[in-house]
């Protein structure tokens, strides 16, 4: 992803680190047990390997945007420092990791739910999913209507990052 579209954009690892868990425990503001377990699992997510992404790409009926592959290898998802998408009402809660022990942070585990429509790349706080479609554009899968909204949010992955503010 070229640096211009990434200017001032950082990605924080999704989940809870051991230090953060201790902090929350000290302040007595831990989430419920299940959520806590999931967030700890999500934090333990390893880096994505080029080989596993290549294997996934072979199984797919669609190409994967090169810039998105680079993003996965470099950041493997995370919480963007800017999370609103210009020109839409979409807010990004987090970009998904390629693979994670927490299913709802794991592209590879969520993909079967969307197959024909695209690759899940991010989630919104409302529980909707951003998909990278076969035409390489980014669409919103609205969980209320269980379908894709017709107009793309962005024309490509790089364009999506550029639109974040």
Question: Language-model segments: what does each one mean?
Answer:
Residues 127-131, 145-152:
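Short, surface-exposed beta-strand/loop "edge" segments at domain boundaries and coil↔beta transitions
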Residues 147-165:
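Compact, glycine/acidic-enriched structural inserts
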Residues 139-144:
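Catalytic Cys-His active-site segments of thiol-dependent hydrolases/isopeptidases
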Residues 2-129:
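A surface-exposed partner-binding patch
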Residues 132-136:
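Short acidic-glycine loop/turn motifs at beta-strand connectors
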């Amino acid at each position: 992803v070229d640096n211009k579209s990434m200017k001032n954009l950082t990605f924080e690892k999704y989940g809870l680190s051991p230090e953060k868990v201790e902090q929350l425990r000290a302040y007595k503001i831990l989430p419920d047990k299940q959520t806590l377990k999931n967030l700890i699992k999500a934090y333990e997510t390893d880096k994505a390997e080029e080989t596993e992404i290549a294997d996934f790409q072979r199984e797919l009926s669609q190409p994967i945007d090169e810039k998105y592959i680079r993003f996965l290898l470099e950041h493997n998802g995370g919480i963007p420092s800017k999370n609103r998408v210009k020109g839409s009402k979409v807010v990004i809660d987090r970009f998904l990791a390629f693979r994670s022990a927490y299913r709802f942070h794991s592209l590879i585990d969520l993909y079967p739910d969307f197959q024909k429509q695209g690759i899940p790349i991010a989630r919104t706080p409302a529980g909707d999913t951003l998909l990278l479609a076969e035409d390489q554009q980014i669409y919103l899968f609205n969980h209320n209507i269980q379908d894709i909204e017709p107009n793309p949010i962005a024309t490509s992955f790089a364009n999506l990052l550029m639109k974040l503010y």
